[in-house]
Amino acid sequence: MDQQPLPGTPSIWAIGDVHGCVDFLDALLARPEIADEPECRLWFVGDLINRGPASAATLRRVMGLGERATVVLGNHDLRALEIAAGSVRPGRRDTLNDIFMSPDVDELLDWLRARSLMHIEAGHVLTHAGIHPDWDAATAMSLAEEAQHALRGDDWRQTMHALQGGSPRAWSPKLHGEQRLRFIVGAFTRMRLCTRDGAMALGARATPGHWPQGTLPWFDVPERRCADTPILFGHWATLGLLVRRDVACLDTGCVTGGVLTAFRLRDRKLLQVGPDALPAQATPIASLVANA
């Protein structure tokens, strides 16, 4: 992605993984570049919740933005739905009890599962982990809508159970049933590394400079089919901020002592808020995570 403004691009800010760090989000929204333009749009790359101290408050804050906010689902957002459905048990690092103990828990979860896996607008794609190398934008959107239909149905709890278990590493249009659903959702919410022929390596260590032999970031797979449309994503705090012509990773680890990043599509401007921008009484996020 170059640094030249795109004529006609609406005023949209894409915001990285919040992870329940509502103080970071409030500090970011208070920045004059955003606060002084109340009509600007706010895109969230997913993982609004979990690991941080205020998952319920974060959901309510984003819900309160109304139509200004566009949110795609991340793996931690799905984690809350999986726990609610009884398909997994909470882990020691999960910080979702404030959602489950809230009087409006049903409203919060219903709002969450109504979010999308992919959004495309203003010549950009928004998704949590990325777009599988074998998919062009139209194919990816069709598959996202297919999975979203299952997540939004009355039998959504059964869908969350169906997501448990392994999935194929390689994509085939012939996949069906639970295997197809797991692959689609895994690609949109968990993918980081692939082999050169596009097989996902979901369990591989994804630390830059230490990729397992034979793997590379999904966005560097040769002949990736969605390379002509810039993709905004998160999910990869160890990769950190990455801005190129074709992709931008906006997960800058606010929940582990880093910063929360916003990226303006119009002119590629970056905003970041870190711990020094938080109220004095706020609990350091890194210590909360360490003790979780």
Question: Model features per residue range: what roles?
Answer:
Residues 17, 47, 62, 74-75, ...:
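Divalent metal-coordination and catalytic microenvironments
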Residues 141-292:
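Acidic, His/Gly-rich catalytic cores of divalent-metal-dependent hydrolytic chemistry
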Residues 56-59, 63-179:
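Active-site neighborhood of divalent metal-dependent phosphoester bond hydrolases
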Residues 1-8, 35, 62-64, 117-120, ...:
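A short acidic-Thr-Gly-centered motif at the start of a beta-strand
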Residues 12-19, 124-130, 249-250:
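Active-site-proximal beta-strand elements of phosphoester/diester hydrolases
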Residues 1-61, 65, 78:
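N-terminal active-site segment of His-dependent metallophosphoesterases
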Residues 19-23, 50-53, 76-82, 133-134, ...:
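Active-site environment of divalent metal-dependent phosphoester hydrolases
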Residues 15-16, 42-46, 71-74, 231-234, ...:
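Active-site neighborhood of phospho(di)ester-bond hydrolases with catalytic His/Asp-centered motifs
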